[in-house]
Amino acid sequence: AMRLLVIGSGGREHAMAWRLAKTPGLQKVFVAPGNAGTAREHELENIGITDPEALADFAEQNKVQLTVVGPEAPLAAGVVNVFRARGLKIFGPTKEAAQLESSKDFAKRFMARHNIPTAEFATFSESTAAHAYIDQKGAPIVIKADGLAAGKGVVVAMSLEEAHAAIDDMLSGNKLGDAGARVVIEDFLDGEEASFIVMVDGKNVLALASSQDHKRIFDGDQGPNTGGMGAYSPAPCVTPEVHAKAMREIILPTVRGMAADGIPFTGFLYAGLMIGKDGSLKTLEFNCRMGDPETQPILMRLKSDFVDLLEHGVDGTLDQIEAEWDRRIALGVVLAAANYPETPKKGDVIQGLPAGNSFGEDAHVFHAGTAEQDGRVVTNGGRVLCVTALGENVKLAQKAAYEAAVKISWDGMQYRKDIGFRAINR
């Protein structure tokens, strides 16, 4: 009887645990710390532990065969290093390898060193020099906090005023704390974005299904950036040609480069791609974990045994398997709390949740910022739920997801009404 552990509490981790729960011969999936959604599903059990050493103790005591890490913070804190030192099987990058995400400066220097296509950049920790560089470059221009900032450390400044204000916020105003003590300023890139997520075992790569995220809070990609308001898979802009090019120009050089630099990468590697009108590719960013909300539609389409993929990843044998996908489209819509992406309102009672989080075989509600209070599910974060559905095409998947989403409500609930619009407008 197999026991597994998923580290994290978001929609991505709920989707991982839900998919792992379908494993033949499974006894239990522990989720640390989990949320109200993972608390309510049959084979899942929440455990209130977040400290890496304590998690490793738990895994030893409960004979957990395999652990998978969802979010970036535990990776940057070295949870993989701790588990590996004790001989525990865990899929994810070490603290050192996770710098591809935890430091924008590390990632940009790495890409420059290994000739991986990305936007031209400069790094600053002192605001006078940063302001001067912006005046020299002009707008539009992109300013990124160096450290982890929950997807909110990026400002795409369309004017010089906006660019200077972002520098003041991050470097002088210390709005993002330590994460913003250094900034990376880079050229603005135009084109269509896609999320290209692969599994890496140190040397071999297994590509997962492509997807496209929707970062802005409002319809038509308006308003401030968020952690992501919805996603669908596959992304039609990732044609077979783009796929081959991404593997050849970005993914494989990254995996080889990390190994050559003495920091072999194991885990999920997520390259944010910018696909130019001419078919050129640039790397916008690296994440060293699956995306949220992209994981929800991706895992809804996965037909292969997820545990099998993870075990090959841990054992260094990803070259021996292929992943099989549902040919339908999966589309997920994030339902967010009032006032997100600013400080979200918490504690609102959520109405209309289906039993077992499921609206039938082809529509599922993945929980993120939820908690249980007096037997009821309440909002407990910015992105609260992700309603994900399968359909024969993007339009039908979109229709199914929104038909499910409207059954759920709470005070101030907000969501985008146009997830998937780029694929539909193609």
Model-derived segments and their meaning:
Residues 2-96:
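ATP-binding N-terminal substructure of ATP-dependent carboxylate-amine bond-forming enzymes
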Residues 21-22, 38-40, 91, 113-115, ...:
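Solvent-exposed alpha-helices and their adjacent loops that cap or buttress functional pockets
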Residues 45-51, 122-126, 157:
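Short acidic-hydrophobic, aromatic-tinged amphipathic segments that line or gate anion-handling sites
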Residues 51, 371-374, 378-426:
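Generic C-terminus detector
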Residues 93-153:
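A conserved helix-loop-beta module that forms one wall/lid of the active-site cleft
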Residues 153, 157-295:
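Internal nucleotide-binding/catalytic subdomain
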Residues 247-269, 287-360, 373:
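Active-site "cap" helix and flanking loop/linker of ATP-utilizing ligase/carboxylase catalytic domains
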